[in-house]
């Protein structure tokens, strides 16, 4: 009996900049389709937003504050029925810096 996990590769991508994230997704989709595998996604996952509030001055002016935020964009993809060529091509793929990749087989 075959399991579902061997019939697909689940890829989760994270980045601070959505533009480089979309470029990385496009490279993975092109690579998977060129090797004959199907692609489901990319599915945009909710963006994590971390907000930080700090005082502008060190000693006085409590009312004067500055706010910063950090956004983490995420995408989820499934590569359906991957071949050995697909796995090799994904292993050799160089993605832009700043993109975190999680692969589950």
Swiss-Prot record:
Offer a single GO CC term for the protein: ribonucleoprotein complex
What's a Pfam family in this record? Ribosomal_S10
Biological process annotations from GO? translation
Give the domain of life: Bacteria
**Claim: Manganese is one of the keywords in the record:** no
User: From the record, what ranges are coiled-coil?
Assistant: none
Species name for this entry? Desulfovibrio desulfuricans (strain ATCC 27774 / DSM 6949 / MB)
Protein's job: Involved in the binding of tRNA to the ribosomes.
Q: Name one GO molecular function term.
A: structural constituent of ribosome
* Family statement drawn from the similarity comment of this UniProt entry: Belongs to the universal ribosomal protein uS10 family.
Q: What are the leading ranks of the lineage?
A: Bacteria, Pseudomonadati, Thermodesulfobacteriota, Desulfovibrionia, Desulfovibrionales
Keyword field: Ribonucleoprotein, Ribosomal protein
What name goes with this protein? Small ribosomal subunit protein uS10
Gene3D superfamilies cross-referenced by the UniProt entry: Ribosomal protein S10 domain (3.30.70.600)
Q: What is its quaternary makeup?
A: Part of the 30S ribosomal subunit.
By its UniProt entry, which InterPro entries does this protein fall under? Answer: Ribosomal_uS10, Ribosomal_uS10_CS, Ribosomal_uS10_dom, Ribosomal_uS10_dom_sf
């Amino acid at each position: 009996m075959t399991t579902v996990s061997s019939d697909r590769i689940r890829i989760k991508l994270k980045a601070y900049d959505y533009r480089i994230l979309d470029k990385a997704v496009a490279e993975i989709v092109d690579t998977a389709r060129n090797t004959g595998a199907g692609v489901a996604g990319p599915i945009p996952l909710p963006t994590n937003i971390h907000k930080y509030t700090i005082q502008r001055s060190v000693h006085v002016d409590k009312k004067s504050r500055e706010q910063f935020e950090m956004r983490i964009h995420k995408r989820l993809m499934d590569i359906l029925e991957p071949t050995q060529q697909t796995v090799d091509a994904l292993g050799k793929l160089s993605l832009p810096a700043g993109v975190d990749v999680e692969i589950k087989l």
